[in-house]
Amino acid sequence: MANTPNFEEEIHCSFCGKSASEVKKIVAGPNDVYICNECVALAEGIIEEELTVDRAAEVLSLPTPHEIVNELNDYVIGQEDAKKTLAVAVYNHYKRINENVAPTLDVELQKSNIALMGPTGSGKTYLAQSLARILNVPFAIADATTLTEAGYVGEDVENIILKLLQAADFDVAAAERGIIYVDEIDKIAKKSENVSITRDVSGEGVQQALLKMLEGTTASVPPQGGRKHPQQELIQVNTTNILFIVGGAFAGIDTIIKERLGERVIGFGSDANENAEALNDDNILHHVQPEDMTKFGLIPEFIGRLPIVTVLDELTISDLTRILTEPKNALIKQYTALLGLDDVELEFQPDALDAMASVAIKRHTGARGLRSIIENVMKDVMFDIPSRDDVAKVIITKASVEQGEQPELQLKKVSE
């Protein structure tokens, strides 16, 4: 006959078997299950150990600023000051993330987003892309000119986060450590300092919408894009650890800077002398101040979310010829490899490289215009070569670039 439970008996921990008199506390659960304070403490320790291992796995292996610059040098020519500034900023950003994962400090480290200023084709986008590649984190590019306030025709700011999610294969944890580059940020400057009856839906309104993203918020992201599928389930993404890099040419801000410096040159003293020297700087953007950006049309709150401002210089002919030949994935190396697949050598004469660089400068396209220039020069060659088996080498001359003459062809020697 089965024993009938005796409720007057002393209860025991269901895990270690100790009685109530042997421990400080026993907690009762459903179905006559009990756990003592000692087993609770033991379980807590096991869980904490596992969480520590998980947190350690989340800590990024972080290259030093020197290592970041050295790797950037493999891909980016020139812009030494910008590379150094970005390397330090990115290192500190991900060091901050690692600290948040496994805290050791009493101080809360805040995020510092980055603004890049420089002419078209100076390498702003490419620098941001290269940083993401070096750090092996998800990367997305957004165009500020397509963004509008919620409720207006255009893209919601949440779509920026969607692009990062897509780059991370919808791994939310990976996306939350990614880098977003917002291009043409100068195009969302306020149209005027005067209040207008017509709403500036792609200017100040977008700046306001981006504010929370930049400082850190939990964004509700529609996985299929913004407004076409209103019933879709939203993905929650915390932007606190996403590094935002914004870039723009800021055409016209040089005039604002000169006006400010010019007003302060009048008079005597070291400040007046410094301002006079600044006015003669080849790149006046190096002297930009938050007040200049405010006058340009960015609201103070938005500028405050971009504490790091770095300036890229306009590329010279020397810079552009180096860009054509030196980086690991230089265009000349790419086209040489392409013709090599057809068993044909490719040579660019030095003055041809200078000529291509000059064309890019005249067109004000910078580095991004080099590929189209090469494509134009190489078009007929790349059309004909696959159909010929007698060509050993193609030589691109200065005349090929400037006058549109056909490249020189060296034919294979006919064996007797």
From Swiss-Prot:
Read off the Gene3D superfamilies from this record.
Answer: 1.10.8.60, ClpX chaperone, C4-type zinc finger domain, P-loop containing nucleotide triphosphate hydrolases
Q: Which family does it belong to?
A: Belongs to the ClpX chaperone family.
Q: Which domain of life is it from?
A: Bacteria
Provide the ClpX-type ZB domain boundaries: 1-55
Give the protein's biological function: ATP-dependent specificity component of the Clp protease. It directs the protease to specific substrates. Can perform chaperone functions in the absence of ClpP.
The record ties this protein, via HAMAP family, to: ClpX
Q: How does it assemble?
A: Component of the ClpX-ClpP complex. Forms a hexameric ring that, in the presence of ATP, binds to fourteen ClpP subunits assembled into a disk-like structure with a central cavity, resembling the structure of eukaryotic proteasomes.
Tell me which residues bind ATP: 119-126
Q: Which GO terms describe its cellular component?
A: HslUV protease complex
- Name its species: Leuconostoc mesenteroides subsp. mesenteroides (strain ATCC 8293 / DSM 20343 / BCRC 11652 / CCM 1803 / JCM 6124 / NCDO 523 / NBRC 100496 / NCIMB 8023 / NCTC 12954 / NRRL B-1118 / 37Y)
Mind listing the UniProt keywords for this protein, alphabetically? Answer: ATP-binding, Chaperone, Metal-binding, Nucleotide-binding, Zinc
Stored PANTHER family? ATP-DEPENDENT CLP PROTEASE ATP-BINDING SUBUNIT CLPX-LIKE, MITOCHONDRIAL, ATP-DEPENDENT CLP PROTEASE ATP-BINDING SUBUNIT CLPX-LIKE, MITOCHONDRIAL-RELATED
What is the designated name of this protein? ATP-dependent Clp protease ATP-binding subunit ClpX
